[in-house]
Amino acid sequence: MAFQSWAQGLIDDHTWMTIKSIKGVRGSRIEKGRALQRKEMAKLVFHCEEEKTLIGIRDAAIFMLGAGCGFRRAEIVNLCLDGVDKVNRSVRVIGKGNKERLVLCSDTVWDYLSKWLFYREKVLELGIPNVFCVIYKGQHIDTSRPLTESAVYAMLKNRAAESEVQTFTPHDLRRTFATRLFENGNDANIVRENMGHSSILTTQRYDKRDKERALRATRDIHVI
């Protein structure tokens, strides 16, 4: 509007330059997402194990790949059996931009993934190559139907409610992975490589350490 007024001769050059020099009001918003606490992860996984069902074993493995390897929801559902290297205990996925990356599993992550693979590999014949499949009635693995992204979202939501854990998104598991890497003293470039990011600025947004410390700090204030 100001430019049009200046162009039409309704305001003089001095007024126009004054208006141009005024900077817009800057603001910020609280970033979305969070990193799950270790006790929350323990509750979720324990709840899965306590069921003593194939669904529980499968879901525990999904939790571990999300928080222990930083896999996106799409990467989890599209993970294929030939992407799992049992010798090196590594998992290979195709991420955003058709970029392939290899992630080494920790002992804990591998233990949970192996438990699921033990049952999954018993039903390889005439099936899809996906690691994670639909399970009927708790015990029947349907190798013709891969797990979907929406099914993973619903599973996490239900598990959180059943375990009395604060609601979180599938991507929060990925944020948890990045935050744990930072907590272990890894530099941002190492975290970026493991996350499959192109930009280190993107990786830094996944670091939730300062946010959690800031929130906890206010709880320690004694007003009176």
PLM regions and their residue ranges:
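Conserved catalytic core of the tyrosine transesterase superfamily
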Residues: M1-I224
